[in-house]
């Protein structure tokens, strides 16, 4: 970065500070990960300069022959990786992929169903503050109060009563396997379309470690980062019969020109996900998450639904008298990066000061952490939670965290 250092020291310094932060902290945010050096190089390539409105072979600008080539690579690899009939790799984000899917599959004012945000859903699945809550008539479904898993029986009851045009599944904080076959059966009973957002679990699905929604869903949306370890962006998979509607919803309805440097990076990430090592990585992520859940239980902490089937755990801190906001700040000061999160059915919580925290192992596993390091990290978490606001404890843990982190290079950076 010699040119940037000279031309814009302020931005250069911010990047260097962020690099140091990445190296000296343990990232347990379930939606974050580290990309490879190859992905970073593709995203910083000369494709940044190219405008490519339209689709391969049908561009509105000249000079797109190589943009066509790289987008076709990304499309073909996404279709192969997820066994899909059609793929659109242009969405700038998961939220924009979702918006395009809505515009293609339903009309404003139609009834849709989505998992309520406080039960693990996502803003774009029907939240009142999101475009979905403003443009559509939303019926929320939730979890069973005893099992803290999706209440499929009540979901079916609500679907029969309200006859939605589309049911949305997928989550941002749900630690259990999603039953796509049951969702499909419910949709068929009410003649509804099924949209599945696999942003969090795309890597697990690609590796065959979580059931795939592709055989059941009319449309599947996702991000290309998180467990997939690609650049920040989105993509859409669908059945061929919806391909034209999906493509038109992305361009020209939702977006203009795609970010071709990001499309190139997506192509690289999809190729990386086809390698045997990617499956090994996902298996290690699941193993680490099981170890994390067990160690958290040993600390006496309550896990929502009692455990996890995927890459994340949701911890209810209310029994120990700590809120998620204070926990997030204290852990950050100690070099452990997590996010506060609402807990299903918890009382006296807000989005800003929720009752719990969400932890995940994708980034730590990418860095090379195994069960031993996860156990050590959970031990530090327990120490911080028992000593909220104790600066001496935070400084002690921070020093130990930095010492551990120096043994594990950050992918894409420490090479």
Curated annotation (Swiss-Prot):
User: What keyword terms does UniProt attach to this protein?
Assistant: Amino-acid biosynthesis, Cytoplasm, One-carbon metabolism, Pyridoxal phosphate, Transferase
Could you tell me which InterPro entries the record lists for this protein? PyrdxlP-dep_Trfase, PyrdxlP-dep_Trfase_major, PyrdxlP-dep_Trfase_small, Ser_HO-MeTrfase, Ser_HO-MeTrfase-like, Ser_HO-MeTrfase_PLP_BS, SHMT-like_dom
Q: Give the GO terms filed under biological process for this record.
A: glycine biosynthetic process from serine; tetrahydrofolate interconversion
One of its Pfam families is: SHMT
Its needed co-factors are: pyridoxal 5'-phosphate
GO cellular component terms, alphabetically, are:
cytosol
| Molecular function, one GO term | pyridoxal phosphate binding
Instruction: Report the enzyme's class at the first EC level.
Output: transferase
Q: Which locations, inside or outside the cell, does it occupy?
A: Cytoplasm
Q: In which pathway does it act?
A: One-carbon metabolism; tetrahydrofolate interconversion; Amino-acid biosynthesis; glycine biosynthesis; glycine from L-serine: step 1/1
User: What catalytic activity is recorded?
Assistant: (6R)-5,10-methylene-5,6,7,8-tetrahydrofolate + glycine + H2O = (6S)-5,6,7,8-tetrahydrofolate + L-serine
Residues that span the membrane, as ranges:
none
Q: Which residues carry this modification: N6-(pyridoxal phosphate)lysine?
A: 226
Positions of the record's site feature: Plays an important role in substrate specificity: 225
What Enzyme Commission number does this protein have?
Answer: 2.1.2.1
Instruction: Classify the source by domain of life.
Output: Bacteria
Where does the chain bind (6S)-5,6,7,8-tetrahydrofolate?
Answer: 117, 121-123
The job of this chain, per UniProt, is described as: Catalyzes the reversible interconversion of serine and glycine with tetrahydrofolate (THF) serving as the one-carbon carrier. This reaction serves as the major source of one-carbon groups required for the biosynthesis of purines, thymidylate, methionine, and other important biomolecules. Also exhibits THF-independent aldolase activity toward beta-hydroxyamino acids, producing glycine and aldehydes, via a retro-aldol mechanism.
What PANTHER family does the record point to? SERINE HYDROXYMETHYLTRANSFERASE (PTHR11680), SERINE HYDROXYMETHYLTRANSFERASE 1 (PTHR11680:SF35)
Assembly behavior: Homodimer.
What family is reported?
Answer: Belongs to the SHMT family.
HAMAP family in UniProt: SHMT
Per its record, how is this protein called by name?
Serine hydroxymethyltransferase
The species this protein was found in? Dehalococcoides mccartyi (strain ATCC BAA-2100 / JCM 16839 / KCTC 5957 / BAV1)
């Amino acid at each position: 970065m010699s040119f940037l250092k000279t031309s814009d020291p302020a931005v250069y310094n911010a990047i260097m500070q962020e690099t140091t932060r990445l190296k000296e902290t343990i990232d347990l945010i379930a939606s974050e990960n580290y990309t490879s050096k190859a992905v970073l190089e593709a995203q910083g390539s000369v494709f940044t300069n190219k405008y490519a409105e339209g689709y391969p072979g049908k561009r509105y600008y000249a000079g797109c022959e190589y943009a066509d080539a790289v987008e076709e690579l990304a499309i073909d690899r996404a279709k192969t990786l997820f066994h899909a009939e059609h793929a659109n790799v242009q969405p700038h984000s998961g939220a924009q992929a979702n918006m395009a899917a809505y515009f293609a599959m339903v009309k404003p004012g139609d009834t849709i169903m989505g998992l309520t945000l406080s039960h693990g859903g996502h803003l774009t699945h029907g939240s009142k503050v999101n475009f979905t809550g403003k443009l559509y008539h939303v019926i929320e479904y939730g979890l069973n109060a005893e099992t803290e898993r999706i209440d499929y029986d009540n979901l079916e009851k609500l679907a029969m009563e309200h006859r939605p045009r589309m049911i949305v599944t997928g989550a941002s904080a749900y630690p259990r396997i999603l039953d796509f076959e049951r969702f499909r059966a419910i949709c068929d009973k009410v003649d509804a379309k099924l949209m599945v957002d696999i942003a969090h679990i795309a890597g697990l699905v690609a590796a065959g470690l979580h059931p795939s929604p592709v055989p059941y869903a009319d449309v599947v949306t996702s991000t290309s980062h998180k467990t997939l370890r690609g650049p920040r962006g989105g993509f859409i998979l669908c059945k061929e019969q919806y391909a034209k509607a999906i493509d038109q919803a992305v361009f020209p309805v939702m977006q203009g020109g795609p970010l071709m440097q990001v499309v190139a990076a997506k192509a690289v990430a999809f190729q990386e996900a086809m390698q045997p090592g990617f499956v090994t990585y996902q298996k290690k992520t699941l193993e680490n998450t099981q170890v994390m859940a067990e160690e958290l239980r040993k600390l006496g902490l309550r896990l929502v639904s009692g455990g996890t089937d995927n890459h994340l755990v949701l911890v209810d801190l209310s029994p120990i008298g700590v809120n998620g906001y204070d926990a997030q700040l204290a852990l950050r000061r100690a070099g452990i990066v997590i996010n506060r999160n609402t807990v299903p059915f918890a009382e006296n919580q807000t989005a800003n000061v929720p009752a719990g925290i969400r932890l995940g192992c994708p980034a730590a596993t990418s860095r090379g952490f195994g069960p031993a390091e996860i156990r050590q990290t959970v031990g530090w978490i327990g120490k911080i939670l028992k000593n909220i606001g104790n600066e001496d404890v935070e400084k002690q843990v921070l020093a130990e965290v930095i010492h551990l982190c120096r043994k594990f290079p950050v992918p894409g950076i420490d090479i």
